[in-house]
Amino acid sequence: MQQDISETDDLNLPSKLILNNKEFQSGTKIVRKHGCGSIVGTLSGPHRKVLFYLYQNKGQVVSKQILKRVGWAGKAVTCASVLVAIYEIRRVLDCRCIQTISNEGYVMAD
């Protein structure tokens, strides 16, 4: 079940995530290859929050509105910001694990 998100929530997101042999850490935008540590790309803070939230809610459709509040809490952003975040996450992950559900949102495959 998805967490309720408000403008002031401090999300309980993991500090580290390994997906598709890539290592993401909440405290740095650098993405490393798992095991050898070589840098494979970067992911901004809001984009990492979106990724970690989708991971925590694997198998569930998460709306763009929720992802806006997760990544950019308290800031006025459009759905285009979410679209860019999903694009960048997919590019860095180099996999098809995040699917678009038309008129609903996004889901990370189990």
Predicted features along the sequence, with ranges:
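Secondary-structure boundary/capping signal
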Residues: 62, 75-76, 97-98
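A broad structural signal for alpha-helix termini and local helix breaks/kinks
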Residues: 71-72, 93
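DNA-binding patch around the recognition helix
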Residues: 5-26, 31-35, 39-43, 82-110
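Glycine-centered flexibility sites
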Residues: 59, 74, 103-105
